[in-house]
Amino acid sequence: MSGRVVSVLRYLLAFALVGVVGWGLQPLRLHLQQKERNAGLLLPAPEFDKTDALAQQLAWFSLGGLRTFAAEMLCVDATNAWLLQDWPRAHRRWSQITTLCPRRVNYWIRAARDMAKNAVAWVGNDETLSTHEKAVRSNDYLDAAEAFLQEGIANNPGNALLWLELAAFDEDLARRTNFTRAVENYRKAVELGASPMYRRWEFYNLCRIRGREQEAWQLGRELYREERHRAPSLRCLLLVLQNKLNIPEESRFTPEQLFGTRERARKQLRAFLHNDLRFPTTGIRELLHDE
């Protein structure tokens, strides 16, 4: 028997096996689709670029009810795109992955981080790009990251992890910031079951917003009542806020109340004064000078 005939027979056998497996999985596929319909989770068939060979091949699996399998295969290629620093391809893959499995919160988070951190960092280090080109491309990837998170929340509005991720995106000082939205997102995440510790991050972002000092002061005093919230930054910010708001002497905290001793207060306040977290520092220099 010639080698060509053997090769043809092997292909025929492979197709036959695929057909048998597909036929065997048909009852399970129909059952799962019915469950998805009953739960209101059945999604439309994803659209793929006709020039994208891998996505086209995996489209058959997704149409057969194997969306998770297809998404995992695309995750492998997204990782390969990361290794090759091929960020347009990585963005395309994550868009396809999140379309296939919009209820998988981890996919949305990974997609956003890949764009906001990895892609933006690569653009910043690319010496072939001009300053203007770097700014434009970085902004495009940040837009993509934000879009992934917002679409993830739209598909999973009750998931606290996505709200936390968007809050962290909004407060990242290395990129563009939106402290007002970060406050709301941390608040929403806690309402949805995230750790109450994130109320402190709500407070930190409130302190960065001009005109909301009174709100920050009230929240800070409330948090200070609990030992677990008494971080050095919170103690320092309480001193700053009472200076900015001209809080009456009888309602103020003293450095000894907040830090235990004057020496500890000086140490913490010096460190706070020289941090780069864009917190207000009203009155700190004067207090240290008086010491």
Regions found by a protein language model. Give the residues of each.
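Hydrophobic membrane-insertion alpha-helices, especially the h-region
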Residues: 7-27
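Terminal, low-structured helical/coil segments at or just beyond the last alpha-helical repeat
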Residues: 214-291
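N-terminal secretory signal peptides that target proteins for export/translocation
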Residues: 1-3
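Short coil/linker segments at helix-helix boundaries
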Residues: 27-159, 164-191, 200-204, 208, ...
